[in-house]
Amino acid sequence: MSRTIFCTFLQRDAEGQDFQLYPGDLGKRIYNEISKEAWAQWQTKQTMLINEKKLSMMNVDDRKLLEQEMIKFLFEGKDVHIEGYTPPSH
């Protein structure tokens, strides 16, 4: 059964996560405030960051960087900047 939350990223009601995806207090905040749609947008940005910056999830500093970028993207409205990336034009 899906649950509806007010997504702080999308600024509207949307389908919430089925379970807490991230540990700790930040994970609780994501579960309560970030929709599946917004999380999917973050996952796309996260994948780009990992690939373009050659991050390793085994490296503590890389994980911290990724967490900081996630907070900026999901809660502060700041887009992820990837040096050298140009979005496709339509």
Curated annotation (Swiss-Prot):
Pfam families: Iron_traffic (PF04362)
Keywords: Iron
Highest taxon of the lineage: Bacteria
Signal peptide: none
GO biological process: cellular response to oxidative stress
Coiled-coil spans in chain: none
GO cellular component, one term: cytosol
GO terms assigned for molecular function: iron ion binding
Bilayer-spanning residue ranges: none
Family, as annotated: Belongs to the Fe(2+)-trafficking protein family.
Assembly, per entry: Monomer.
Protein task: Could be a mediator in iron transactions between iron acquisition and iron-requiring processes, such as synthesis and/or repair of Fe-S clusters in biosynthetic enzymes.
Protein name: Probable Fe(2+)-trafficking protein
Lineage of the species this protein comes from: Bacteria, Pseudomonadati, Pseudomonadota, Gammaproteobacteria, Enterobacterales
